[in-house]
């Protein structure tokens, strides 16, 4: 029998110390990793609930285990809200992550060895879009498209040419590091011309889509996948959506369970249900709009300071900065900004001469900073401070100006104190 007042603190001090230190880091550092965000206390409440105890293999009202009458309600709430939020006819809320949403789509629609056409990782795609180190590149014949070198936007002519040449069974639209608006309809036309399925991975922009700040692909694609964190601000998990197609829906359900997963995580599904409800609130639309405003403001500062912003700006929550001209590595810039308590991630950029472990660029995102209340002016100031730190970096000695970094760190400290994550 458990005492409800039991805590980790006082029982496992090493773990408690690490958790408390991370909580403090999140308050004291500015989070600009594009795939991260802060969830609400309600989402965390669901994830820490007794639902974690319940096994529920199968689907609502079609379980292999008994005692599922209450978790059936939870999962159906999540399904119904996901469909309403994104205008979908079908939703599967069981995937544990974005990658585990993508993999079952491959399983449902393809056979091993089939050809898929996806965005190159080096140009902004995701590992699961055909990278040779991923299941998507190992089990399937992956062909990759990229960006137009002159415009920095998706080269739709190349997509069409590769589709006609290789006749893929599935085309993947979506990205992990692309700052412009994807023309979903253009991808649909290309897919139809070669008889391919169209899968859209909207993991990064799902929150913007939900708020009407980015085009909705759900009724255009055959299948749409997403994570539920990032701009959607829910738990770290996955989701599959689709327009009406009973045959595909049946295949997708079977590919998730029993194909790719066993029992769903009911506490996480409850957290998704909460997040979907939060995303329907008027405040969320205001948030999503501000995310874009802040990203544009930051990208403009970087360009004004002479840095190469890939695609020459942003129309969503993120942008890439290339330091090829400056001869700096993303690894060095990442470390320098980290010392200033600004968290970003190094990222490969088009025509990057460095390895993925080093890179020549960084990815900057405003989903988390906007959640904690950063304004457009805050974002401009922050970008300027970042540029100061980057300007002080010396690649030859792999160092930076400690005084500049210390000055920025103090400014970051003051801004974080004024904009707490959890009050």
Curated annotation (Swiss-Prot):
Its cofactor is pyridoxal 5'-phosphate. The record marks 229 as: Plays an important role in substrate specificity. Keywords: Amino-acid biosynthesis, Cytoplasm, One-carbon metabolism, Pyridoxal phosphate, Transferase. InterPro entries: PyrdxlP-dep_Trfase, PyrdxlP-dep_Trfase_major, PyrdxlP-dep_Trfase_small, Ser_HO-MeTrfase, Ser_HO-MeTrfase-like, Ser_HO-MeTrfase_PLP_BS, SHMT-like_dom. Pfam families: SHMT. CDD domains: SHMT. One of its GO terms (cellular component) is cytosol. Signal peptide: none annotated. It is found in: Cytoplasm. The modification N6-(pyridoxal phosphate)lysine is found at residue 230. One of its GO terms (molecular function) is pyridoxal phosphate binding. Pathway: One-carbon metabolism; tetrahydrofolate interconversion; Amino-acid biosynthesis; glycine biosynthesis; glycine from L-serine: step 1/1. Its EC number is 2.1.2.1. It catalyses: (6R)-5,10-methylene-5,6,7,8-tetrahydrofolate + glycine + H2O = (6S)-5,6,7,8-tetrahydrofolate + L-serine. (6S)-5,6,7,8-tetrahydrofolate binds at residues 121, 125-127, 355-357. GO terms for biological process: glycine biosynthetic process from serine; tetrahydrofolate interconversion. It is an enzyme of class 2 (transferase). NCBIfam families: PRK00011.1. Belongs to the SHMT family. Catalyzes the reversible interconversion of serine and glycine with tetrahydrofolate (THF) serving as the one-carbon carrier. This reaction serves as the major source of one-carbon groups required for the biosynthesis of purines, thymidylate, methionine, and other important biomolecules. Also exhibits THF-independent aldolase activity toward beta-hydroxyamino acids, producing glycine and aldehydes, via a retro-aldol mechanism. HAMAP family: SHMT. Homodimer. This is Serine hydroxymethyltransferase. It comes from Hydrogenovibrio crunogenus (strain DSM 25203 / XCL-2). The lineage of its organism: Bacteria, Pseudomonadati, Pseudomonadota, Gammaproteobacteria, Thiotrichales.
